[in-house]
Amino acid sequence: FWCVLVVVTILLTWKNKRLPLVGLCLIAATSSFWQEFFGDWGAYVAWNPAFAKLPFWGEMPFTTPVKPLFIPFSWGWWFAVSIPLLVTLVSWLGQKFPKLSTNWLSLLIAFPLFLAYQIYVEGSSVANGWWTYDVVIGPALQTEKGRLPLIFPALLGLWAAYFVAKLAKRDTDGFWPHEVKMGIAAKPAGWRRELARIWAMIVLFQVSFFIFNIGSAMLGRALFGGPSLLVP
């Protein structure tokens, strides 16, 4: 499916002479996969060692020991699908209900949808033994094969609300606020501007995702966590 999205991105870019949101999210999310393993360390996530592993990244301090090969691709396709859909929905509702702010619409829509999906997927994955949380802090879902803390899906939902709110706002020329602030809107149309848009999306995605999800998990473990046999 990741490859299909690459083809879709190429075709849409060729047609419109402009990178679509799907493609920007695909590139930004795929390039951000490395954050997964630092966040897993903070959240005490232990992956099933039966998964095929990344060939170039073994054990490393402050990361979970098992690093599945599919993570870059799963990050890419999931965010390339979910974020544009939510942005489209929030933008459409914003036109229907102009008195409601984009931030509130995003919080009311993106947060609960992302939260519900994460709880469902992670809960079923933990139940299937794909991964588990060796140490759990706060309320959690309990299964025969593992536990799922609820704080991390909630943080991801908050990030989604923030990120969608940022992307649901465009100026009359179709540029997002972060592109305007970075001076991209002033650049002439062409591949140089599109390359700048890629880097801008990567920065927005990686910085915001790290602050909301990865840094908070790592800081929480460093301050309040304890030892772990599965995720030392």
Regions found by a protein language model. Name each.
Residues 1-232:
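Aromatic-rich, lipid-facing transmembrane alpha helices and their immediate juxtamembrane interface loops
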